[in-house]
């Protein structure tokens, strides 16, 4: 899933750049939205991973 969020960010960057160069504000804004969405997904993925690691650590220490 991390690859998907990185891809979405890269795709957004390309769209934003092309939109900027061609003076296409719709494409530029779409790129900004894709980048923001990709960053948000990456943030959520990282939070889930950290929560899972924390839960696993707590479960591992429970029996001690």
From Swiss-Prot:
Residues 25-40 have a biased composition (Basic and acidic residues). Residues 1-40 are annotated as: Disordered. It comes from the Bacteria. Transmembrane segments: none annotated. It holds the Pfam family CsbD. Belongs to the UPF0337 (CsbD) family. This is UPF0337 protein SAOUHSC_00845. It comes from Staphylococcus aureus (strain NCTC 8325 / PS 47). The lineage of its organism: Bacteria, Bacillati, Bacillota, Bacilli, Bacillales.
